[in-house]
């Protein structure tokens, strides 16, 4: 039987990223064969990852990659903020964003794409990271914007490092105007989107079901006034106009200069850019948005650990 030396364990640990005791056991099980031990650890790691995959991942990071005419934003969730501060996790989410640039920007396409550092699909690379880092992780959402002429401006809020943070925004500006001007106004609009979370770019693009729900609420509220139906209809129309102004990007008061709407601010920028500017897309990913975090019972958690 091959002697399992400290140097052999160290080599396996460096190659696999697994713990020392796991590496030693793997080498014993495979009679000191490094490659076989890596496979053994991978099998064990996949098993551990599968057990962890049922746990809620609501922390993590949002990452942005790209500039110029295209950019992507991705959300990689973890179970704890502690792991999100881990260098390996941060490198992983940045790498996934870079990979996403060469895809159509859907989670499915990104998951199937090859992660250069591992030579494996992104989905498998995440699974390996689950086994190594020890928490469930989920590539939850992604968005990609691209323009033939113009820029896709980006903004990260609460940045945890270069291109990573808790909130990421993309905004696509179609224009043949000056790129520096487009990038500047684009970043300002992206910051505005981060702050206000508009439902659509233009009023007519607001989801019909959302608008109808608001209209019904306004009708019921207005009827409580006891006024005639003709008056109620005018009241509702007025409130709907205000609603659209508040939720559509171009009609919102610009956070950088509240005296202007976003649309008016873009019109002003056109003078410097030397060409028309059209907002043709936006994406806003807030970390953990819509994910219900588990409220763990401490006593039950301790009992679960005690049971192994």
From Swiss-Prot:
Gene3D superfamilies according to UniProt: 1.10.286.20, DNA helicase RuvA subunit, C-terminal domain, Elongation factor Ts, dimerisation domain
Molecular function per GO: translation elongation factor activity
Any matching Pfam family: EF_TS
Coiled coil ranges: none
Highest taxon, organism lineage: Bacteria
Keywords: Cytoplasm, Elongation factor, Protein biosynthesis
One cellular component (GO) term of this entry: cytoplasm
Subcellular localization, as worded in the UniProt entry: Cytoplasm
Xref: SUPFAM superfamilies: Elongation factor Ts (EF-Ts), dimerisation domain, UBA-like
Main subcellular location of this protein, as a coarse class: cytoplasm
NCBIfam families referenced in this protein's UniProt entry, alphabetically: tsf
Primary role: Associates with the EF-Tu.GDP complex and induces the exchange of GDP to GTP. It remains bound to the aminoacyl-tRNA.EF-Tu.GTP complex up to the GTP hydrolysis stage on the ribosome.
Protein family (similarity comment): Belongs to the EF-Ts family.
Protein name: Elongation factor Ts
Encoding gene, per UniProt annotation: tsf
């Amino acid at each position: 039987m091959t002697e399992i030396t400290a140097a052999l364990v160290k080599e396996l640990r460096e190659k696999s990223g697994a713990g020392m005791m796991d590496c030693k056991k793997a080498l014993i099980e495979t009679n000191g064969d490094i490659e076989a031990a890596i496979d053994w650890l991978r099998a064990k790691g996949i098993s551990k990852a599968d057990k962890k995959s049922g746990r809620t991942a609501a922390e993590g990071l949002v990452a942005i990659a790209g500039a110029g005419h295209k950019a992507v934003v991705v959300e990689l969730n973890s179970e704890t903020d502690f792991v999100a501060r881990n260098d390996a996790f941060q490198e992983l989410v940045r790498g996934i964003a870079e990979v996403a640039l060469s895809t159509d920007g859907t989670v499915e396409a990104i998951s199937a794409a090859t992660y250069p550092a591992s030579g494996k699909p992104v989905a498998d690379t995440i699974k390996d990271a689950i086994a190594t880092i020890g928490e469930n992780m989920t590539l939850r959402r992604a968005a990609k914007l691209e323009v033939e002429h113009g820029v896709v401006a980006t903004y990260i809020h609460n940045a945890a490092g270069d291109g990573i943070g808790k909130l990421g925004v993309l905004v696509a500006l179609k224009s043949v105007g000056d790129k520096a001007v487009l990038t500047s106004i684009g970043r300002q609009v992206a910051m505005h989107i981060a702050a206000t979370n508009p439902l659509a770019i233009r009023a007519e693009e607001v989801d019909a079901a959302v608008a109808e729900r608001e209209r019904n609420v306004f009708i019921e509220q207005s009827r409580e006034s006891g006024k005639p139906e003709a008056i109620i209809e005018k009241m509702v129309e007025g409130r709907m106009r205000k609603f659209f102004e508040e939720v559509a990007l171009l009609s919102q008061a610009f956070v950088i200069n509240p005296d202007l709407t976003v649309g008016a601010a873009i019109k002003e920028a056109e003078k410097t850019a030397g060409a028309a500017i059209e907002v043709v897309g936006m994406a806003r990913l807030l970390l953990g948005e819509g994910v219900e975090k588990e409220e763990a019972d401490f006593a039950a958690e301790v009992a679960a650990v005690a049971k192994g």
